[in-house]
Regions:
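Alpha-helical transmembrane segments in inner-membrane proteins
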Residues: 2-346
Length: 346
């Protein structure tokens, strides 16, 4: 009886902790979005933001800066950061490996290769590449790459070797992309180079509409599968015992993770370490790995991480702008190393 009461108390304590952490993340995200709107080459006072967002001073320079540059950019960082974090969480669950993420497994590189191929072909024919076309190309590249990784997984029992295989697949895709660039025209090379560095800048409102539809829809699907995801975390045998069709569920996980990763790669280029670092940090803060608790916090954490890194990327050495991947790697890599060392000590 005492043991049962203790377990109930611990569970209610964890639930309360999760609610508090999630609320704090939401508040931090709102503050960070406000900072992104205010800070830049043109400083916009915080008390001007509500008026600008409500449609006041529509013709002022501050209004144009917010509506045409900063707001689309910060929304892109928030949505794509959350998507990348969720994708990392799904892949870590799928492979049962804490360092699995779209960048490490080569999924981002595969998406980059197909987008580059499509971009060069279309630009060579003097045709613009639409936002849906970029997402479709990146999704195809993600699926092809993760398909290769899964084929390798059938022959390799060690998850560590699987990660190495994913890295090698990523290198092959990167080499193929560089090969394509060598034969592209000057304009294509410039476009591909700028895109491949990774950045949330340049997002139009049409891009934001596509990003929002894809990310919100897929994230809702991820949240809808929290129960089978919880069962899957406890092992395939347990998942089967509670009625989960494991083979079909694995396909669903791959499709959802690939779609999220593809959307990020299509609009921001390859972004590293977000998918590894954020899920670890979120689970450590929540003291829980239950998907129903981790998924919302993971999305908020990814949004905060990318919005913060983007603010640093565009303001630290202004007017020179850093690649978003350079900043995420600077902050993400030490976090991953620290967490792995902490786990090894335990």
């Amino acid at each position: 009886m005492g043991s049962r009461l203790s377990m109930t108390y611990d569970e209610s304590g964890r639930a309360a902790r999760c609610r508090v952490v999630t609320a704090l993340l939401a508040v931090a995200l709102i503050v960070l979005v406000g900072a992104n709107l205010c800070i830049g080459s043109v400083l916009v006072p915080a008390d001007h933001i509500p008026g600008i967002l409500s449609g006041g001073a529509a013709n002022s320079m501050e209004s144009q800066v917010i509506w045409e540059i900063r707001l689309p950019r910060v929304l892109s960082a928030v949505l794509l950061g959350g998507a990348l974090s969720l994708s990392g969480f799904l892949l870590q669950t799928f492979f049962n490996n804490p360092i699995a993420d779209p960048f490490i497994l080569g999924v981002s590189s595969g998406a980059k290769f197909v987008v580059a191929l499509t971009m060069i072909v279309l630009l060579g024919a003097n045709q613009a590449m639409s936002s849906p076309a970029m997402v479709a190309a990146a999704f195809l590249g993600s699926l092809i790459t993760i398909g290769f990784v899964l084929l390798i997984a059938r022959r390799i029992s060690s998850m560590d070797m699987l990660i190495v295989a994913g890295v090698m697949v990523g290198y092959i895709c990167s080499a193929a992309t560089n090969f394509l660039i060598a034969f592209a025209d000057d304009q294509s090379i410039v476009n591909l180079h700028n895109w491949s560095l990774g950045s949330f800048s340049g997002s139009s409102w049409n891009d934001i509409a596509v990003i929002a539809v894809v990310v919100i829809t897929v994230s809702a699907c991820v949240f809808a599968i929290t129960k089978p995801l919880s069962a899957f975390q406890l092992g395939e045998a347990y998942a089967k015992s509670v009625g989960v069709n494991v083979a079909r569920f694995r396909v669903v996980l791959v499709l959802l993770a690939s779609m999220l990763s593809a959307c990020v790669t299509a609009f921001a280029g390859p972004v590293s370490f977000v998918g590894i670092a954020v899920p670890h940090l979120v689970k450590s803060a929540l003291k829980s790995s239950k998907p129903i608790r981790v998924i919302p916090a993971c999305f908020l954490g990814g949004a905060i991480f990318c919005a913060g890194c983007d603010l640093i990327a565009r303001t630290l050495f202004s007017p020179v702008e850093l690649s978003i991947s350079a900043v995420t790697a600077i902050f993400g890599a030490p976090v991953v190393i620290a967490l792995m060392l902490k786990k090894r000590v335990r």
